[in-house]
């Protein structure tokens, strides 16, 4: 999936996450996480984000994640909404989701 434009998904409310994405000129993933629960769940948050990006074959992006203690399922949903917005596709290929 190609990221064509910057996009935002989520809120800064307690129990939610706000994620910003922007395309990069390289194939790197620049991931910056700011979380109120980073010491306890930072590795799990990072793993979830990288898993979703790998699933949709996303490279060459900058991600800024402001986590306020969100659940894994919400993090995944916010990421999928963000990817759809940033790539300009109207819907994700749900049949490919497992």
Swiss-Prot record:
Q: Does the keyword Phosphoprotein apply?
A: yes
The protein's name:
Citrate lyase acyl carrier protein
Q: What are the top taxonomic ranks of the organism?
A: Bacteria, Pseudomonadati, Pseudomonadota, Gammaproteobacteria, Enterobacterales
- Main localization of the protein? cytoplasm
Question: Which keywords has UniProt assigned to this entry?
Answer: Cytoplasm, Phosphoprotein
**Functional description taken from the UniProt entry:** Covalent carrier of the coenzyme of citrate lyase.
InterPro entries referenced in this protein's UniProt entry, alphabetically: CitD, Mal_deCO2ase/Cit_lyase_ACP
Q: What cystine pairs are annotated?
A: none
Gene (UniProt): citD
An annotated GO cellular component of this protein is: cytoplasm
């Amino acid at each position: 999936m190609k990221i064509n434009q910057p996009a935002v998904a989520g809120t800064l409310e307690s129990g939610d996450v706000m994620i910003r994405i922007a395309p990069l000129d390289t194939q790197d993933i620049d991931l910056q996480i700011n979380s109120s629960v980073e010491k306890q769940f930072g590795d799990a948050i990072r793993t979830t984000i990288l898993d979703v990006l790998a699933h949709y074959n996303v490279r060459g992006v900058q991600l800024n994640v402001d986590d306020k203690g969100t659940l894994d399922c919400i993090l995944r949903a916010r990421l999928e909404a963000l990817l759809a917005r940033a790539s300009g596709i109207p819907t994700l290929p749900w049949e490919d989701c497992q």
